[in-house]
Amino acid sequence: AKDELVDDPRWNGYEVPPTSNANYGWILNIVSKLSQNGVAGFLLANGALSDDGTELKIRQQLIENHLVEAIIILPRNLFYTTDISVTLWILNKNKKARVVEQNRKLKRYRNREDEILFMDLRQMGSPYEKKYIELTEEDRAKVTSVYHNWQQEGYEETYENVPEFCYSASFDEVKEKGFRLS
């Protein structure tokens, strides 16, 4: 069974993910399914942002391959099944500058290959059913606005880093932190 993992085409170009933790196996499965302009979002425990060993090597490869677009830390108690804070990862197979028609409008994306947007939503949300937190419509609108403004040409006019909320990190900054995304 271990030989099957080594030869699995989903890991093509990456380290073989460890059998002891499926997180990076899932990430590479998702990457293998992305189209040329594909975007994926998925949730993982915050520990996946800074795992060492093989996970670190895979994370470094994902960053060097310009796939990680955004890391969004969500508030605790957002889900019924766990009370821990989790992270929304957004991977994008094409972070290059391009123009795309969406809903009969042209969107002008800037080159973001050497950047990752970090957002921390742990201070957002409102109480829900006594023990849960929900992101309000205003919270969701703010997050999506920041994310989309950051992606666009001319973002200098519409996006700014906000302490404790959002930060656009360069590749060099992430490399300096040892490819840890926390």
Model-predicted regions and their roles:
Residues A1-S182:
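A conserved structural/catalytic subdomain of Rossmann-like adenosyl-cofactor enzymes
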